[in-house]
Swiss-Prot record:
Swiss-Prot/TrEMBL catalytic activity: tRNA(Arg) + L-arginine + ATP = L-arginyl-tRNA(Arg) + AMP + diphosphate
Keywords: Aminoacyl-tRNA synthetase, ATP-binding, Cytoplasm, Ligase, Nucleotide-binding, Protein biosynthesis
GO molecular function ontology, one term from the record: arginine-tRNA ligase activity
Enzyme Commission number, as recorded: 6.1.1.19
GO biological process, one term: arginyl-tRNA aminoacylation
Pfam families reported in the protein's UniProt record: Arg_tRNA_synt_N (PF03485), DALR_1 (PF05746), tRNA-synt_1d (PF00750)
Protein known as: Arginine--tRNA ligase
Organism: Bradyrhizobium sp. (strain ORS 278)
């Protein structure tokens, strides 16, 4: 079990100090009681030349203090100058406060990394914090995973790991869409492959059915289990048999595809389970909303612009979504008496709340962006605003090879499968590059570029940083033979290093980057943006590689100084800090941290 960090990290520590100063000023200055300091932040300045940290305290508290922001900033700055961590304080512009820290701060930050090891940056669980449910992938069980599913899968998995690292209790969930019309289409497509397995010439696949070869094994399995008996059955009899078999086999394939990417789920929840058995959760949810006056019989006006698939010109049961922030009210029951997809989704989210989740996160594909407002309205309604829903939209992936679009596969029929991509470039390249752009931006994924061994390939550059660190350790044993090989023993040995020997500005820049890791984890977790970890790792690796390169040209900057064991030990401690943080961040992203690379 990994221990939790026990002390506040540098940015959190400085934030606490700023809060204490502001609280003292509030008390002495007669500010209103109960001032909320949560808007006060301490973060790196956009321009590194402005210092090591910056705070907006004066800007956001000036109104309560009944003072000009710059005047309040000067009061805060005066007290910060007396802090033992601070070397210099500047007030800039209308009232921003920039801080430069004492050089000794950075060696102390490295000492923290060496002391905490894998726990560095990890947040201890907060007692009573809401449980988090992250729903991702949730692809229809109608075929193999394609490259579009891949991005949402990696994003949801990495986000879940990030939130767990940040101290949250997270459940990873897959919602199986096994109750809609698409599974009947799947069954009819599989039945055609069953007839083919029996020796029939089925000709071209009719329009509207799934054309890919991936259903041929389903047809063979049906033949093995039932012989030709299904052919004598009426549709109503064979359809559920074929449907259940096809769904089961497709879900097995989907789970295999997810395993190839090391995508994990704690729960696979069936949509059909909401409406089958003795407890119809969808009907219950509609009754729940009816009792509160949140559904009514009404007629929707025709949609403006493009037609909406769920609009029908008739009197129907509607959810009063506009009362909870949506643009229009939403149908719950179709003209044939079946539930709309939305009705099932409402019941699903109510069921999550009943299971104890108050923080809900859904990962949607780009084609579901219009679904966000209605789902957030539904969650407000069925939880009395006691739960929140954050919807993260994952944009499209353009699959390229040397800049040219990749052709579709025969097996899938009309898309490139996730498995094909993983088999060609490897799991690590897929996972890292799917996270190396913000989720709501279109991603160009070039199969040739992601396996290049160059600085232009981020996954290689970051992994190579970890491998280079271990290479330095191996080489160092020639001049420092007492350096242990085993990681735990090596870290314990390096804790005794005299870190004050790390005095070069380039070394301090690298230590500053390491000190930023806990703050990066915190901000990425709060924003639900795991790409921030990927960006940070690339920046850290870049600074590490740059320092190594400088040592090639300037011998006094080399990590291993043959005639100075004390300095070598201090620099190896710095390398250990880099290796530990790279491994930690890569673990959050689900990417391997190799000790050596060819």
């Amino acid at each position: 079990m990994v221990e939790q960090a026990s002390t506040p990290y540098l940015f959190a520590d400085m934030l606490a100090r700023v809060h204490a100063i502001c609280a003292a000023l509030a008390k002495s200055g007669g500010w209103p009681e109960g001032i909320d300091f949560s808007r006060v932040v301490v973060e790196p300045p956009r321009d590194p030349s402005h210092g090591d940290m910056a705070t907006n305290a004066a800007m956001v508290l000036a109104k309560e203090a009944k003072a000009k922001p710059r005047d309040l900033a000067e009061q805060i700055a005066e007290r910060l100058r007396a802090d033992e961590l601070v070397a210099k304080v500047d007030v800039a512009g209308p009232g921003f406060i920039n801080l430069t820290l004492q050089p000794s701060v950075w060696s102390k930050a490295l000492a923290t990394i060496l002391r905490e090891g894998a726990a560095y940056g990890r947040v201890a669980p907060v007692p009573g914090a809401p449980k988090v449910n992250v729903e991702y992938v949730s692809a229809n069980p109608t075929g193999p995973m394609h490259v579009g599913h891949c991005r949402g899968a990696v994003f949801g998995d990495a986000l879940s790991s990030l939130l767990q690292f940040a101290g949250r209790d997270v459940t990873r969930e897959y919602y199986i869409n096994d109750a809609g019309a698409q599974v009947d289409v799947l069954a009819r497509s599989a039945y055609l492959r069953y007839r083919e397995a029996l020796g029939e010439d089925i000709g071209a696949i009719p329009e509207g059915l799934y054309p890919g070869d991936y259903l041929k094994p389903v047809g063979q399995a049906l033949k093995t289990e039932h012989g030709d008996k299904l052919k004598a059955m009426p549709d109503a009899q064979w359809l559920p048999i074929v449907r259940d078999k096809a769904i089961a086999m497709m879900m097995d394939e989907i789970k295999d595809d997810l395993a190839a990417l090391n995508i994990r789920h704690d729960v696979f929840f069936s949509e059909r389970s909401l409406i089958t058995g003795g407890n119809n959760k969808v009907a219950e949810t509609i009754d729940f909303l009816r009792e509160r006056g949140d559904v009514y019989e009404g007629r929707l006006p025709p949609p403006k612009g493009a037609p909406v698939e769920d609009w029908e010109d008739r009197e129907q049961l509607l959810f009063r979504a506009t009362a909870f922030g949506d643009d229009v009210d939403r149908p719950l029951i179709k003209s044939d008496g079946s539930y709309t997809y939305f009705a099932s989704d409402i019941a699903n989210h109510r069921h999550k709340f009943e299971r104890g989740f108050a923080d809900l996160i859904d990962v949607f594909g780009a084609d579901h962006g219009g679904y966000i407002k209605r789902m957030q309205a539904a969650v407000k309604a069925v939880t009395a605003a006691q739960a929140t829903l954050d919807v993260k939209v994952v944009q499209l992936v353009k699959l390229l090879r040397n800049g040219e679009p990749v052709k579709m596969s025969k097996r899938s029929g009309d898309f490139v499968t996730l498995r094909e991509v993983v088999d060609e470039v490897g799991r690590d390249a897929v996972r890292f590059m799917m996270l190396y752009r913000k989720n709501d931006a279109v991603l160009d994924f070039d199969l040739a570029k992601v396996i290049e061994q160059s600085k232009d390939n981020p996954v290689f550059y970051v992994q190579y940083g970890h491998a280079r660190g271990h290479s330095i350790f191996r080489n160092a044993r020639e001049s420092l033979p007492e350096l242990p090989e085993e990681e735990g023993a090596r870290i314990a040995f390096l804790r005794e290093a005299k870190l004050e020997r790390l005095a070069d500005s380039a070394e301090h820049d690298l230590l500053k980057r390491l000190a930023l890791y806990p703050r990066t984890v915190e901000s990425a977790a709060m924003a639900h943006e795991p790409h921030r970890i990927a960006f940070y790792l690339y920046e850290l690796a870049s600074e590490f590689h740059a320092l190594w390169t400088r040592g090639r040209d300037l011998p006094y900057l080399r990590f291993i100084i043959d005639d100075d064991a004390e300095l070598t030990k201090a620099r190896l401690a710095m390398v250990q800090g880099v290796v530990s943080v790279l491994a930690s961040g890569l673990a959050i992203l689900g990417v391997n941290a190799p000790d050596a690379m060819r």
